[in-house]
Amino acid sequence: MEMNIGDMVAAMAARNEAFRGNEQVPEKVEAYNKLKEHAAAIGKVLRAPWYADDLELWEQNTFVYIDFPLPVNILNDSIRGRIAEMVRLADMVTLAEVRGRLRMTFTVARVWKE
């Protein structure tokens, strides 16, 4: 499902406190699981911390992030390929500086159906 920028921002900003997912969207869960696999592999090779949010029934969206030490120079073709695949899998990618590191956050939106 293609999402435009407005849809992505709305999906992330609108937190429905009453939301209770009752059915996972299989393709979204598959994307999330692949993101976790890639993050774990990158984290292991680069010794970079990473985190994967849990698939919670009350959260429509989930994310995986990796914290790269600055400056970031990635020469390894395999790592670059994994990052490119993560960008392709995610509905939204956010880059931010967090405590002297580059955090790449890969968000999967609408993981649950109500």
Show where each model-derived region lies.
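Short, non-transmembrane amphipathic alpha-helical segments
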Residues: 77-94
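C-terminal edge-of-domain segments
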Residues: 93-114
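Short glycine-rich, basic-tinged beta-strand/loop micro-motifs
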Residues: 18, 50-74
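Short linear clamp-binding motif
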Residues: 2-16
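N-proximal, solvent-exposed amphipathic alpha-helical segments enriched in charged/polar residues
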Residues: 15-51
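Intrinsically disordered, low-complexity serine/threonine-rich segments
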Residues: 71, 81, 109-110
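Alpha-helix boundary/N-cap detector
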Residues: 3, 7, 22-37, 74-81
